[in-house]
């Protein structure tokens, strides 16, 4: 048995104001478990994405979270859950004025290949992206695979 308090975790850099990797602390082997707290404009993901092998479930604890999906926008409010199958593209965003707290669950823990798309200002369209650590590991950037332009920076 493992028992932990969410506030005992270090924050993980990324597109969310608060991201805590609960699965690692609990020693989960077959699923990923993350806690997010999103400021207005924040997301749980670096861009519109799909995991090759992993299904994802998001449980909104507080607030309202809007997902861009292949079927259009879907808004999930407190005490609602949304599921995405492996290979299904999505991106969340806090479009409100308040903070959103959400629990993300992914299984299996090994998500496989990540397909990640973001708007590239140099290419003028949404393109494939890579994520890399920069500044001696103090930040993550998303970079366009086609032209190499930096499309996002997260500390």
Question: Model segments located where?
Answer:
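Short, cysteine/histidine-rich loop/knuckle motifs that typically chelate Zn2+
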Residues: 121-124, 145-146
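Conserved short histidine dyad/triad with adjacent acidic residue
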Residues: 19, 35-51
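Residues immediately within or flanking Cys/His clusters that coordinate Zn2+
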Residues: 114-119, 141
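Ligand-binding loop in jelly-roll beta-barrel domains
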Residues: 86-114
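Short linker/helix segments within small regulatory modules
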Residues: 132-141
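Short, conserved beta-strand element in jelly-roll/cupin
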Residues: 37-38, 50-69
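Short acidic-glycine-tyrosine-enriched beta hairpin
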Residues: 70-89
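A short, N-terminal "cap"/entry segment at the start of jelly-roll beta-barrel domains
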Residues: 1-32, 141-155
């Amino acid at each position: 048995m493992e028992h932990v308090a969410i506030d005992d975790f270090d924050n993980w850099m990324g597109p969310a104001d608060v991201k805590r990797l609960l699965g690692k602390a609990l020693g989960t082997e077959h699923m990923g478990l993350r806690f997010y707290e999103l400021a207005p404009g924040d997301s749980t993901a670096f861009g519109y994405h799909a995991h090759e092998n992993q299904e994802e479930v998001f449980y909104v604890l507080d607030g309202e979270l809007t997902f861009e999906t292949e079927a259009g926008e879907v808004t999930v409010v407190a005490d609602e859950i949304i599921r995405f199958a492996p290979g299904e593209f999505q991106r969340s965003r806090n479009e409100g004025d308040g903070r959103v707290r959400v629990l993300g669950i992914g299984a299996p823990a090994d998500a496989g290949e990540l397909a990640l798309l973001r708007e590239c200002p140099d290419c003028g369209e949404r393109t494939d992206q890579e994520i890399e650590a920069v500044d001696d590991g103090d930040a993550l950037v998303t970079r366009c695979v086609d032209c190499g332009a930096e499309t996002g920076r997260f500390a």
